[in-house]
A protein has these predicted regions:
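Surface-exposed cleft-lining segments at the edges of enzyme active sites
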Residues: 1-6
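Asp-based, Mg2+/Mn2+-dependent phosphohydrolase catalytic module
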Residues: 9-14, 18-19, 27-140
């Protein structure tokens, strides 16, 4: 990841993460298996997002991938949090949203590719990262 020729932040990421970091512990949880944690931190530094995140979790440092409950259980244990204290935000409906829901976490589906909305009591949908602070304020 750190050696990719192009690393770009999603539009609105800096603003959303800066707004959220004051009230939330922010962690990146990725299925990337081509990069170690240090590589991911290096990529985050390239786009200026490293200061907004507290932790990085990936396949190489957990040994599991989403949607495995073991992936989410590892993160909860490491952060000393319960499922009701965590909201998973991700762009994969199956891995991020349903995986989190099956592990007792609430989730937000970041569907930046279509206008589709899927919502239940356990998850919401956003299409732009600028929507995050408002939704998370409602959920807190």
């Amino acid at each position: 990841m750190k050696d990719w020729p192009i690393v770009e932040a999603v539009p609105g990421a800096q603003e959303a993460l800066t707004a959220l970091h004051a009230d939330w512990t922010l962690a990146l949880a990725t299925n990337a298996d081509d990069s170690a944690e240090e590589d991911i931190w290096a990529a985050l530094r390239r786009v200026g997002l490293d200061q907004e995140l507290d932790k990085v979790y990936c396949y190489t440092n957990i040994g599991y991938k989403k949607p495995s409950p073991k992936f989410f259980q590892h993160i909860l244990a490491d952060l000393h949090l319960t499922p009701d204290q965590v909201v998973m935000i991700g762009d994969s409906y199956e891995n991020d949203v349903l995986g989190a829901n099956r592990s007792g976490l609430r989730a937000i589906w970041f569907n930046w590719q279509t206008s589709e909305i899927r919502e239940t009591v356990r998850h919401r949908t956003i299409h732009e990262l600028g929507e995050l602070p408002g939704i998370l304020k409602e959920l807190k």
